Amino acid sequence: MTAVSATTLSTRIGTLELEHPVLNGSGTFDAIAALRAFGPSLRERFPFAAFVSKTITIAPREGNPPPRLWEAPAGLINSIGLPNKGLDGFVAHDLPVLATLPVPLVVSVAGFGHDEFARLVEAIGADARVAAIELNVSCPNVKSGCVMGAEPRETLPLLQRLRPLTGKPLIVKLSPNASDVGAVADAAAEGGADALSLINTLRSTAVDPASGRPWLGAGTGGLSGPAVRAIALEQVGVVAARTDLPVVGMGGVQSGRDALDFLAAGATAVAVGTENFRDPGAGDRVRRELAELIARGGKGDAIETVGAPEAVSKSGSIAG
C-alpha cells in the first residue's frame, strides 16, 4: 500500500501521482460554477490534488423529484438521483472546462448494467484529458436487480468486463450498505481494480413532522457527513486490511485531524464531501491542517501508520 510522504504530502493512487492526499467527493464541489465565480484564482490555488467529477450516465437524467435534501443533526441526507447531461453532454460541455483544471481529472461513471458501464469506460477511457475513472457501483443491475457494488458475485464480473477496456486507473467506489464490504473489495481487486474508494452514503430517510410522511421526494436517500465518520473509519480499516490496493477514505472528513484518522486506518488518500457545502474552502483547509499535524508529529519520511493493516484484524475489528 502506498504511503503518504511526511515531507511533501505526496502520494499515489495506482499510476496517478498526487501532490497531496486530499480529493473531493464526487458531486460535492461544482468546479465549473467555482471557475465562473473565482476565475484564474481558483486554478492558481485549487483545493484538491485531483478533481472527481459528478457521476455521469449514458443518457441524461433529471434526477429524483424534490425535495432532495434534508439537513440531519450531524450530516446531510441527499436524494439527488444522479442528475447529469449524459455521456454526450458531458463530453461536449463539461469535459472541456474540467480539463483546464491544474490537477488530474477523475471522471465518475455509473451504468445500469454491464453494457452501459462498458460504453462509459470505453468512451471516457479513450480521452487523453481524463486521468482515471471512478466506478459508482451503487446502481442496480437491470438484469439481476442487484446493486452491482453490494455483492461480490455482481462486482467481480463487472470488473472483469471493464478491465480490458482501458489502461486508465479504475477506482471502485464501495457502498457501506453491502452485507460484507471486505468481500466486495476482494472481488473488485480480483477483477482488476486499481484502487478503492469508500464509503458512499448510508441508506436513510427523514420524516416531515407536519405530515408524518417521508420528507424526501423519492422517499429515501443517503446519509453523509460527520454522522457516518466512525462507520467509514471502521470500513476503511477492514478494506485496507484485506487488500494491497490504494484506498481513498471518505465519510465525514471535516478537518486535518479527521484526514489523519483515515490515513491511520489505512487510507492512501481522503476525500472531502459534505463539508464542501458548508465551507467551499474545506479542501485547502484540510490539507493545511493535515500538513501541520504531520509536521508536529515528528514523523519520518513517510507516515508510518498509513497502510498498516496489522492495526485492524482480518475480522474487521480494531486491534487494541
Where are these regions (language model features)?
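Hydrophobic faces of well-ordered beta-strands that scaffold small-molecule active sites
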Residues: 22-26, 49-53, 105-109, 133-135, ...
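Catalytic cores of alpha/beta
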Residues: 33-40, 117-127, 178-191, 241-243, ...
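C-terminal helical cap(s) of enzyme catalytic domains, especially alpha/beta-barrels
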Residues: 64-73, 207-221, 263, 275-300
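Glycine/Thr-rich beta-alpha phosphate-binding loop at enzyme active sites
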Residues: 76-77, 139-153, 184-245
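Glycine-rich beta-to-alpha transition loops that act as phosphate-gripper elements at the mouths
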Residues: 108-111, 174-180, 229, 245-257
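Extended, intrinsically disordered, low-complexity segments
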Residues: 229, 284, 288-320
